[in-house]
Amino acid sequence: MFVEHNLIKNIKIFTLAFTLTVVLIQLSRFISPLAIIHSSYIFLAWMPLCVMLSILFIFGWRGVVPVLCGMFCTNLWNFHLSFLQTAVMLGSQTFVVLCACAILRWQLGTRWRYGLTSRYVWQRLFWLGLVTPIGIKCSMYLVGSFFDFPLKISTFFGDADAIFTVVDLLSLFTAVLIYNMLFYYLTRMIVSPHFAQILWRRDIAPSLGKEKRAFTLSWLAALSVLLLLLCTPYENDFIAGYLVPVFFIIFTLGVGKLRYPFLNLTWAVSTLCLLNYNQNFLQGVETEYSLAFILAVLISFSVCLLYMVRIYHRSEWLNRRWHLQALTDPLTLLPNFRALEQAPEQEAGKSFCCLRIDNLEFMSRHYGLMMRVHCIRSICRTLLPLMQENEKLYQLPGSELLLVLSGPETEGRLQHMVNILNSRQIHWNNTGLDMGYGAAWGRFDGNQETLQPLLGQLSWLAEQSCAHHHVLALDSREEMVSGQTTKQVLLLNTIRTALDQGDLLLYAQPIRNKEGEGYDEILARLKYDGGIMTPDKFLPLIAQFNLSARFDLQVLESLLKWLATHPCDKKGPRFSVNLMPLTLLQKNIAGRIIRLFKRYHISPQAVILEITEEQAFSNAESSMYNIEQLHKFGFRIAIDDFGTGYANYERLKRLQADIIKIDGVFVKDIVTNTLDAMIVRSITDLAKAKSLSVVAEFVETQQQQALLHKLGVQYLQGYLIGRPQPLAD
C-alpha cells in the first residue's frame, strides 16, 4: 500500500513537472527577445534555461526526468529534427546544467535549492551564472563538429561568425542573471498558489508600509513613465540619449529601500520590455558589436545590483549585530541597563529584584577585574536554574544584578536565592571567596520615567539588606526609601556646593607630650545654610563619589594660606593633616601636594601627613610611591588608627613612617583591661625599635594619661588634652 502511494505521488509530481516544463518552455521561447545578425535570428536571452533551473530548484532530483522529457519534446516539436539529432541537442543543452546542480548539491548539501536570494548566492552565481552558460556553449560547439543540423539552427552549433557566438553566449548569461528568478517565482506560484501570499507579505508588502509607501509608489510611477517613454514606437533622440541612463539610476535608488526579490522582479520585467520594444532603448545600435555591448551592460548591472543589495543587507546585519552587542555586557555576556531601557513596557507588572554583592568592589580591587567577572558569571550559573523561562537577568553598573521575576511568591523565591548564594563560596585561583549578598524587590509599572527612581531605591534598600541578608520589599518602605535616597542626593549636592565655594572650616585639636609641647591635628568641617556639617556626615559621601583628593587638597591649601599669614619661629611640626586612602591612589597627588607647599613657601616640616587605616589598598604600589615621594620631600608620615588591622603592620614594615597613632579602641578601656595595656606596650616597644614616635587617641581621663605615659606613649590626643577649636581662634 505504501509503495503504491509513493508511485502515485511520483507520477503526479512527474506529470506536473513535465507539463510545466513543456508549457513554460514554449512561453519562454515566445517572450524571449530576438535580434537578427547576418540574416539569422538570435535570442538576446535564452529563457528555456531559466525554465530548466526553475523546475530543478522546485522539484529537486524529481525534476530531472521531466526536464529531459520536456526539452526533448519541445526540441522535436519546434525544430523537426530526427531522433538522434534531438537527443544530441538535448544532451548539449542539459548535461552541463545537471552537472552544475549536482556540484551545488555536493557543496551546499540538501539545502542547496533553498533561500535562493539570501544564502549561498555567490556559489550559485558562479556555477549557474558563469560555468553553466560557458559549458552549454562549449557542448554545442563540440556537438556541432560531429553532427549536422538544419540551417535554421546550425549557427548555434558553431556555424557562424565569432560575434554571433559572443551574442549567443551573452544571451545565456542574461537569461540566468536577469530572468531566472522571474520564472522561478512564476513556477512556484503555479505549483503552490499560497506562495504568492508569502512573496507578497515577505518581499513586497514591507515596501508599501507606512514609512516606505510614498517612496515605493513614487519609484514605481517614475519607472512606469520611463518604460512608457522608452518602449513607445515613437523614436526620439532625446529619449534615447538622455533617459536611458536614468533607467539605471532609478534601480540604484531602489537599493536599500526595496527588498531584493521585488527589485529583481521589476528589473526582469523592465529589461524584458526594453529588449522586446527597443526602438528607443536600442536606437543607434546598428551593429552586432553594439548589441553585444548593450547585453554586457545589462549583465554587469545585474551583478552590481545583486552586489549592492548584498552589501547593504550585510551592513544592516552588522548594524543589528552591533546594536545587540551594545545591549550586552562584553565580559559577563548579560543584557545591560541599555537593554532594559529599550522596551520597559514589556516588563510592566513584573517584580524587579536588585541583588547586591556586598564586598565585590573590595575583592575586585585586591584580586583584579577578571575575578569580578568570574564572580558574576558564577552567581548567574547559580541563579539561572532557579528562574523561570520568561524571567531575565540584567547586569547593572557597579556591584548589582537585576532579576526580573514574573512568578508568584517573589519575596520567598528571592530569599531562597540569597540564602543559597550566602551558603556558597566562589573559588578564584584556588582561593575560596566569601561574598555577602543582599536583595530588595518592588513592582515595576512599565513607565519609563519611574524606572530610574525605582532602581535607585532598590539599590539603596539592597545595600541595607546586606547587613542581615534578609530580602526587603520596596512596597512597604517606598516612602522611607524615597526619602533616604533623596536625602543622600541633596547631601551630595550640598557637599559639592561647599567644595565649589570653598566653605571649609578648619578646627585644631592639640596633641601634646608631658611637657605640653607638640602640635595640633587639623579637623575639617563644612559650612552649609548657616550651619556646620561634621565629618561623620560628609566623609562617607566624599569617599564614595571620588571627591577625596579634591577635599584633601582644599584642606591643605586652606591650612597653607593660614600658615602663610601666621608665620612662626617654632621649629618642628605645627599641624598634622589626615589624608584619605583614595587620595593616595592618585598617581600625581604627591607632586600636587609638593607644588602647593612650594607655592606658599611653607616648609614640609611644619605639617605632618597622616595616613588613615584602610583594610587593603586596591593599588598599593601607587600609594607607596606617593608616600615615598612625600617622605623624600621632607614630610613626616604618621600612621593613623594603628593596631586595628594587618594592613597597618604591612604598611609599617614597608613604609619609612615617623609616627604611630594608636587607635582609641585600645585606649578607652586601658585602665581596666590589661589586654589593651599589653597591646599598647607591644606597639610602643615596636615603635621604639624603629625610632618612631607614638600618639594615643581618645584620651579623656587622667588615669589613662598616667598609664599611657608609663607604657611609653610620648604624645596624647583627646578631650582631656583639649577639644577641637576653630583654627581662626
Swiss-Prot record:
Gene3D superfamilies the record matches: 3.30.70.270, EAL domain
Pfam families tied to this protein: EAL (PF00563), MASE1 (PF05231)
- The EAL domain covers 488-729
The protein's annotated catalytic reaction(s) are:
3',3'-c-di-GMP + H2O = 5'-phosphoguanylyl(3'->5')guanosine + H(+)
Q: Name one GO cellular component term.
A: plasma membrane
Recount the UniProt induction comment for this entry.
Expressed during exponential and post-exponential growth at both 28 and 37 degrees Celsius. Repressed by RpoS.
* Ranges where the GGDEF domain occurs: 348-476
Question: Topology in the membrane?
Answer: Multi-pass membrane protein
- Transmembrane ranges, per UniProt, are 17-37, 41-61, 83-103, 126-146, 163-183, 214-234, 238-258, 289-309
GO biological process per UniProt: regulation of single-species biofilm formation
Q: What is its EC number?
A: 3.1.4.52
Q: Which UniProt keywords apply?
A: c-di-GMP, Cell membrane, Hydrolase, Membrane, Transmembrane, Transmembrane helix
Localisation per UniProt entry: Cell membrane
Enzyme class label = hydrolase
Primary site of residence: membrane
Gene Ontology molecular function: any one: cyclic-guanylate-specific phosphodiesterase activity
Q: Name the CDD domains on file.
A: EAL (cd01948)
Cited function: Phosphodiesterase (PDE) that catalyzes the hydrolysis of cyclic-di-GMP (c-di-GMP) to 5'-pGpG.
Name of this chain's protein: Probable cyclic di-GMP phosphodiesterase PdeA
Name of the gene: pdeA
